[in-house]
Amino acid sequence: MSVKTFAAIDVGSFELTMKIFDLSGKNTMREIDCIRQRIDLGSDTYAHGKISNEKIDDLCHTLKEFAQIMESYKVTAYKAYGTSAIRETQNTLILQDQIEQRTGIRVETLSNSEQRFLDYKSIASKGETFRRIIEEKTAILDIGGGS
């Protein structure tokens, strides 16, 4: 079965973002929704070395809502990635286990290099727009939240 609707979830240092895409056109991807929820995971990780139980509860609650939204859109595939706050917390494995058990969503942790690669790849995927901006002197800067 081919993927028709795809969700991408970014568990960032300061915010969770889920984008839903329609992939039904030939070689096209159309964003059909973007949901954001501010949860400051980074403040726990960077100040205390681990994410608090309260923030884990907030995170799981939001991801459950994301799962319901994915169901309403009939999402057939998803990817969920954690970045700096997840990568650098002392309780990464416990956190990932809690998320998967409580929400059914598996969050993979990206290394800093993997995160940057995906960011640049998404910019380059803009096709003609990307080709046009790199014809002149161009700098692409990554100003991330936590990394």
Describe the role of every protein-language-model region.
Residues 1-11, 19-143:
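Nucleotide/phosphate-binding catalytic cleft detector across ATP-hydrolyzing
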Residues 14:
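Primarily the dimerization/phosphotransfer
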